[in-house]
């Protein structure tokens, strides 16, 4: 019974490793395909993420954080 349980656990771990590595490899392949595709290098714009970050904190943000911390 112990041997069967150990074999089951090892099989589950190996299956999980295979499933996760497949997802990682497909994501890397899609990324490389998008970069080295026909228009991939022309459309490469790394500044798109700058719009998501606002480095300035307004007074309203500080007041809101103070209310949260009370």
UniProtKB/Swiss-Prot annotation:
Miscellaneous comment as given in the Swiss-Prot or TrEMBL entry: Negative results: does not show antiviral activity.
- N-terminal signal peptide: 1-23
Function field: Amphipathic peptide with antimicrobial activity.
Native source organism of the sequence: Heterometrus petersii
Q: Which residues form the propeptide?
A: 40-70
Indicate the transmembrane segments per the record.
none
Keyword vocabulary terms for this entry? Amidation, Antimicrobial, Cleavage on pair of basic residues, Membrane, Secreted, Signal, Target cell membrane, Target membrane
Tissue distribution: Expressed by the venom gland.
What is the annotated localization of this protein?
Secreted; Target cell membrane
UniProt record similarity statement: Belongs to the non-disulfide-bridged peptide (NDBP) superfamily. Short antimicrobial peptide (group 4) family.
Residues with the modification Phenylalanine amide, per the entry, are 36
Q: Which GO terms describe its cellular component?
A: extracellular region; membrane; other organism cell membrane
Q: What is this protein called?
A: Peptide Hp1035
């Amino acid at each position: 019974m112990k041997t069967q349980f150990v074999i089951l656990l090892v099989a589950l771990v190996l299956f999980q490793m295979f499933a996760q590595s497949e997802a990682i490899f497909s994501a890397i392949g899609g990324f490389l395909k998008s970069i080295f595709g026909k228009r991939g290098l022309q459309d490469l714009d790394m500044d798109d993420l700058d719009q998501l970050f606002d480095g300035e904190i307004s007074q309203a943000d500080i007041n809101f954080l103070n209310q949260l911390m009370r």
